[in-house]
């Protein structure tokens, strides 16, 4: 208990300290990847996106928040653990790149804009079956108006239409896959920080509760969690904007706790 309390204090202190840094977001720029060196490197997955998946400033759907969100999360990881993760160097890797299999954990966002190719489906299947852990974030049901769909998206397209697009794509990856709604009793919410309630997780959008779903090996909740899904929220937005003062520190703390737990779980399972 004392260790967890100390870590919570360290997390709050670290989040407060991040306020001195500038925030996002100018034109999109993709940075060179670093070679694998055995040190933990956060990996973001690149993918083929459908119509409407290119946003303001040339940001592709897969790239929102890159690399600042994960850089801030890695600063927190190094504050509360001895992981010694790379902080400034964030790798953005295509599913078709064999280098992906050197990394046990990968992060992907805005998956309802994903126009999954056959090669991407096959690569993701192999990655998961070989033990890779995938964190999915930042997508929601389609809504009308300013916050609905993508900026300049095609209203006649299924892309940007929330869960149904992603679920259909995952049936191409693992045809028997069944996502299970998770509650706070799941081990992933207790691997480092004790997250006893999910109804306090901040909402990055404009309505509804965040929904947490998991994909388990053989669809058995007693087996390995292969994919963790944050639906109807954008946890990484709190990491990304934590240096701006635009998000409450308490909410940002909860988002960082999730990120830390996800990484610890992925690295130990």
Q: Model regions: which residues?
A:
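An acidic, glycine-rich "communication" segment
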Residues: 23-26, 50-56, 142-241, 251-256, ...
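Bacterial N-terminal signal peptides
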Residues: 5-17
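Aromatic-Pro/Gly-enriched surface loop or interdomain linker
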Residues: 19-105, 109-112, 234-235, 241-269
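Short alpha-beta junction capping motif
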Residues: 42, 105-157, 163
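Loop/turn elements at helix/coil->beta-strand transitions in domains of secreted/extracellular proteins
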Residues: 38-41, 101-106, 129-134, 177-178, ...
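Surface-exposed patches in mature extracellular/periplasmic domains of secreted proteins
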Residues: 83-94, 136-139, 176-185
């Amino acid at each position: 208990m004392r260790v967890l309390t100390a870590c919570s204090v360290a997390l709050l202190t670290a989040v407060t300290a991040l306020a001195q840094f500038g925030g996002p977001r100018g034109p999109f720029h993709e940075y060179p990847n670093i070679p694998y060196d055995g040190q933990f490197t956060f990996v973001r997955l690149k993918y083929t996106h459908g119509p409407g998946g290119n946003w303001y400033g040339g940001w592709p759907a897969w790239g929102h928040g890159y690399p600042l969100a994960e850089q801030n999360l890695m600063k927190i990881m190094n504050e509360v653990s001895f992981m010694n993760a790379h902080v400034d160097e964030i790798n953005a890797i295509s599913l078709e790149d064999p280098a992906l299999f050197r990394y046990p954990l990968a992060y992907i966002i805005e998956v309802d804009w994903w126009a999954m190719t056959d090669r991407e489906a096959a690569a993701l299947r192999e990655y998961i079956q070989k033990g890779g852990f995938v964190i999915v974030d930042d997508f929601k049901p389609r809504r009308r108006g300013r916050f609905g769909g993508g900026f300049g998206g095609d209203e006649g397209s299924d892309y940007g239409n929330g869960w149904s697009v992603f679920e259909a794509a995952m049936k191409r990856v693992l045809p028997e896959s069944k996502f299970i709604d998770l509650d706070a009793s799941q081990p992933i919410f207790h691997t480092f920080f004790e997250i006893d309630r999910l109804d306090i997780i901040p909402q990055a959008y404009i309505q509804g509760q965040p929904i947490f779903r998991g994909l388990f090996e053989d669809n058995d909740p007693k087996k390995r969690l292969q994919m963790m899904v944050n639906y109807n929220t954008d946890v990484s937005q709190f990491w990304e904007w934590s240096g701006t003062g635009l998000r409450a520190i308490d909410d940002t703390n909860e988002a960082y706790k999730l990120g830390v737990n996800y990484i610890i779980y992925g690295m130990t399972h």
